[in-house]
A protein has these predicted regions:
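Regulatory inter-domain linker segments that are low-complexity and enriched
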Residues: 1-7, 91-171, 196, 204-213
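Hydrophobic, helix-prone linear segments
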Residues: 1-27
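Short polybasic amphipathic segments
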Residues: 7-12, 68-72, 118-126, 182-185
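A generic structural motif
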Residues: 10-14, 53, 62, 124-126, ...
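Forkhead-associated
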Residues: 19-82, 88-89, 135-205
Length: 213
């Protein structure tokens, strides 16, 4: 990226949709109360939620240990460890990983026949509580608006078949299925994630796009 390249953040979705913020050199905070990118009416933002870093013509974003996290749109298949959070449409989801197998030597409650290995994906609702969930043997777990393993028919930002998790004993590989609204993964706090024009970042209710200009 050229040192002369000018960058800006445009709010694509949220109460400030259409607003644009030019990014000067240095560290640019984003949150409800601190920094250049302020969204005081967003209840899901920390006072200082994330920081954009512009240095030597390069741009990165860093989550500042915010409770609701910073998410980036995936451009290729992304590896998920058990417990990882990702977002599709208006839904926050957690990949739970493989469920504990039932010991053949212990008594157990009656139920449907058990698969040799099940993998879990669950919705996280406001307050961090679990919502809808599914457990499937794999190798693929699908998420979308309808006709998928985990479906959310009322979500207008979800494609009919939005994303897939290709599961294995060590985790999962998350793939977006060419959707208009994309699939997002949560960044670990404190890690600087490189960005280029065209990338999208979600913080709280705000969907931000990196652009030249």
């Amino acid at each position: 990226m050229s040192n002369q390249l000018r960058l800006k953040v445009t709010v694509v979705r949220g109460r400030s949709a259409g607003s644009a913020f030019r990014l000067p050199k240095g560290m640019i905070g984003a949150g409800s109360a601190k920094g250049l990118l302020l969204f005081p009416d967003d209840p899901y933002l920390a006072p200082l939620h994330a920081t954009f870093l512009v240095k030597d013509g390069e741009l990165a974003v860093r989550d500042e240990a915010s409770p609701s996290g910073t998410f980036v749109r995936i451009k290729k298949a992304e590896r998920l460890a058990p417990g990882s959070l990702f977002a599709a449409g208006d839904h926050l989801l957690r990949f739970g990983g493989p469920l504990e197998p039932i010991s053949p030597n212990s008594p157990t409650a009656y139920g449907a026949p058990a698969s040799p290995q099940l993998f879990a994906v669950e919705e996280i609702v406001v307050g961090g509580r679990p919502g809808r969930a599914c457990a499937r043997p794999g190798p693929v777990i699908s998420v979308g608006r309808n006709g998928t393993d985990l479906s959310f028919p009322g979500d207008k930002h979800l494609a009919a078949r939005h994303c897939e998790l290709h599961v294995d004993p060590g985790g999962a590989t998350l793939r977006d299925l060419g959707t208009a609204d994309g699939t997002y993964v949560r960044l670990p706090p404190g890690v600087e994630y490189p960005l280029v024009p065209g990338d999208s970042v979600r913080i709280g209710m705000q969907l931000l796009r990196i652009e030249q200009g």
